[in-house]
Amino acid sequence: MSDKSIKMQAKVLKMFSTDKYELELLENKVIIKGHISGKMRIHKIRILPGDIVDVEISPHDLSNGRITYRHK
């Protein structure tokens, strides 16, 4: 995404497949859809419901995001 993307933290609510998730933003409790970034897919980083993750959201489409980091 561009440098204008919105970076937020979210909690994973549901896992639809290995790379599609339903996320709840921690700041304002909004539910969005998210997918994992390419680097996370390459390194086989697994994300489970309940995990806290960093999400980049495009200002053009606020209902979809990209998961860039999983907090330990």
UniProtKB/Swiss-Prot annotation:
What gene name is given for the protein in this entry?
infA
PROSITE patterns per the UniProt record, alphabetical: S1_IF1_TYPE
Tell me the compartments it is located in: Cytoplasm
Any one GO molecular-function label of the UniProt entry: translation initiation factor activity
Recorded protein name is Translation initiation factor IF-1
Function field: One of the essential components for the initiation of protein synthesis. Stabilizes the binding of IF-2 and IF-3 on the 30S subunit to which N-formylmethionyl-tRNA(fMet) subsequently binds. Helps modulate mRNA selection, yielding the 30S pre-initiation complex (PIC). Upon addition of the 50S ribosomal subunit IF-1, IF-2 and IF-3 are released leaving the mature 70S translation initiation complex.
Q: Which organism is it from?
A: Mycoplasmopsis pulmonis (strain UAB CTIP) (Mycoplasma pulmonis)
Q: What is its main location?
A: cytoplasm
GO cellular component terms attached to this protein's record: cytosol
Family according to the record: Belongs to the IF-1 family.
Which intervals hold domain S1-like?
1-72
On the tree of life, the source organism's domain of life is Bacteria
How is the subunit organization of this protein annotated in UniProt? Component of the 30S ribosomal translation pre-initiation complex which assembles on the 30S ribosome in the order IF-2 and IF-3, IF-1 and N-formylmethionyl-tRNA(fMet); mRNA recruitment can occur at any time during PIC assembly.
Heme keyword on record: no
InterPro entries in the cross-refs: NA-bd_OB-fold, RNA-binding_domain_S1_IF1, TIF_IF1
This protein's UniProt keywords: Cytoplasm, Initiation factor, Protein biosynthesis, RNA-binding, rRNA-binding
